[in-house]
């Protein structure tokens, strides 16, 4: 089940409300990524506290471990990971693409060796739909081939040609039809999204988009971006494609990106975003703040008593209030620098909490700006603040 209400617009930017089987999602929204059924380093209750409304699961990796049988035993991913709100699962197409020469693509699907134990596996649109039905995710993604920006090995390959992108895009369209047919055969009560492909070629993007609209999916994603292309190429496709999708359906930009990418994506008509950047960067000492990015490993933070971001209300920056009124948490840059230098587990946990809170709070501010009819003013101030530097 999916219902999308478009509440207000400003230019291409949209404020909406997405109703799914496990709850309501206010858009635009950022979706934290839980590859193996967990958002790394963060408890589910903390995700809810910081405003996460929907999270991602990774079909490919959950198929590898723990497998369909365990997922079926638990009745799906929600009970398995103790998350009661909506979940989106990707189809496995991107992960198969990332295997490189370890996989062989045909009309039927993709053959590859399991990266876990070397078993020979065959992933098809039908199998992807079957796995995602067992996972019982609120939003299911069609099985697609992620069109790469670069063909072949680094330094000896070539940028994907229009002919190569067309072959890949047309295969994804045939797989979209097969995904939809299998999804219907299984009686899956959730929502299936189609994925626009076409590489860096706008004409192919439009061809893919129009064909998917003919198939009439409940929602649509723009895939094949942030796959190694230069930033200006990604921005060109981001400016071209999302606003051409049906206005009455949710629009999802896959795997993007930086805080600036999210705000610019909203301006291009995107409703939904996901990216591993908040947690991956956190584990490497890279923190996002209102006034730019902060590298906590730098020696200049060794004795700095300030929080990461004095405007942030997350547990790492401000702490939380206990029932007896005492405040717990709220840590200095010096302490977080110390944890990072010593390799202490608490360091990346607090950094992940901060980065996710920053992303989720940014999208809350975007929604409030759209509600107030001042999104472009917010966007300008956001960029000025980020450029100021910490």
Curated annotation (Swiss-Prot):
Pathway membership: tRNA modification; tRNA-queuosine biosynthesis
Active site: 90 (proton acceptor), 274 (nucleophile)
Enzyme class name: transferase
Cofactor(s) recorded in Swiss-Prot or TrEMBL: Zn(2+)
EC number: 2.4.2.29
Binding positions for Zn(2+) per the UniProt entry: 312, 314, 317, 354
CC cofactor note: Binds 1 zinc ion per subunit.
Annotated region (RNA binding), positions in chain: 255-261, 279-283
GO CC terms, sorted: cytosol
Domain of life the protein comes from: Bacteria
Pfam families: TGT (PF01702)
Assigned protein family: Belongs to the queuine tRNA-ribosyltransferase family.
PANTHER family documented for this protein: QUEUINE TRNA-RIBOSYLTRANSFERASE
Purpose of the protein: Catalyzes the base-exchange of a guanine (G) residue with the queuine precursor 7-aminomethyl-7-deazaguanine (PreQ1) at position 34 (anticodon wobble position) in tRNAs with GU(N) anticodons (tRNA-Asp, -Asn, -His and -Tyr). Catalysis occurs through a double-displacement mechanism. The nucleophile active site attacks the C1' of nucleotide 34 to detach the guanine base from the RNA, forming a covalent enzyme-RNA intermediate. The proton acceptor active site deprotonates the incoming PreQ1, allowing a nucleophilic attack on the C1' of the ribose to form the product.
Description of how the protein assembles with itself and partners: Homodimer. Within each dimer, one monomer is responsible for RNA recognition and catalysis, while the other monomer binds to the replacement base PreQ1.
Annotated protein name in UniProt: Queuine tRNA-ribosyltransferase
Classification lineage: Bacteria, Pseudomonadati, Pseudomonadota, Betaproteobacteria, Burkholderiales
Gene that produces this protein: tgt
């Amino acid at each position: 089940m999916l219902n999308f209400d478009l509440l207000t617009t400003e230019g291409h930017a949209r404020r909406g409300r997405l109703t799914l089987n496990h709850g309501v999602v206010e858009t635009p929204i950022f979706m934290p990524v839980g590859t193996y059924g967990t958002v790394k380093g963060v408890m589910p209750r903390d995700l809810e506290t910081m405003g996460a409304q929907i999270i991602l699961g990774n079909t490919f990796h959950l198929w590898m471990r723990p497998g369909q049988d365990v997922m079926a035993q638990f009745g799906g991913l929600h009970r398995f990971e103790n998350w009661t709100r909506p979940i989106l699962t990707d189809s496995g197409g991107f992960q198969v693409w990332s295997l490189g020469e370890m996989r062989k693509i045909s009309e039927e699907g993709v053959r590859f060796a399991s990266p876990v134990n070397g078993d020979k596996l065959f992933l098809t649109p039908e199998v992807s739909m079957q796995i995602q039905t067992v996972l019982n995710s609120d939003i299911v993604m069609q099985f697609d081939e992620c069109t790469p920006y670069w063909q072949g090995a680094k330094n000896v390959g070539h940028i994907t040609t229009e002919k190569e992108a067309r072959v890949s895009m047309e295969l994804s369209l045939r797989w979209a039809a097969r995904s939809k047919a299998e999804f219907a055969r299984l009686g899956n009560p959730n929502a299936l999204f189609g994925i626009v492909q076409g590489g860096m070629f706008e004409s192919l993007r439009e061809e893919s988009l129009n064909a998917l609209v003919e198939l009439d999916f409940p929602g649509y994603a723009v895939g094949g971006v942030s796959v190694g292309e230069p930033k200006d190429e990604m921005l060109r496709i981001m400016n071209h494609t999302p606003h051409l999708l049906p206005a009455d359906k949710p629009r999802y930009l896959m795997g993007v990106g930086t805080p600036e990418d999210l705000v610019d994506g909203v301006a291009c008509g995107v409703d939904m975003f996901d990216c591993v950047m908040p947690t991956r960067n956190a584990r490497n000492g890279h923190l996002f703040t209102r006034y730019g990015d902060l590298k906590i490993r730098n020696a200049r933070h060794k004795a700095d008593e300030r929080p990461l971001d004095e405007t942030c209300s997350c547990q790492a920056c401000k702490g939380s209030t206990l029932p007896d009124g005492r405040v717990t948490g709220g840590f200095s840059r010096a302490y977080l620098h110390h944890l990072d230098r010593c390799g202490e587990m608490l360091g990346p946990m607090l950094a992940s909490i901060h980065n996710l809170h920053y992303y989720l709070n940014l999208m809350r501010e975007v929604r409030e700006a759209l509600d107030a009819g001042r999104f472009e003013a917010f966007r300008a101030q956001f960029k000025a603040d980020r450029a100021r530097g910490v």
